[in-house]
């Protein structure tokens, strides 16, 4: 895609292969921090939903700090959402304790894209047809 569309604004030359290789090597830079941040938010989500019915932390900030300390969050990493504005916690029972679904979605995405990688092209028509038939069109009609 980059070779086709990324061009120099003045010369219209395509992006150099060396720059594409540098981008590929750097694409996962810092990913571990992002994974830890998502996991920290998911752990906080699970902790609040594991509380007995009707129990609300008296000090939400202290509750969050305790949960993250007990789970071993490395100092300086931070979280995606501070407990006091983490709206996913309060979207009703259909979203209760489910923030980890974003991590699961990344796993499924990587697995599906792996089929295109194995085929040698992100535009492989055969793989795209299987994705359409077995995932998109099937939707939730088949038991996992």
List PLM regions with ranges.
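C-terminal, non-catalytic "cap/extension" segments appended to globular domains
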Residues: 1-144
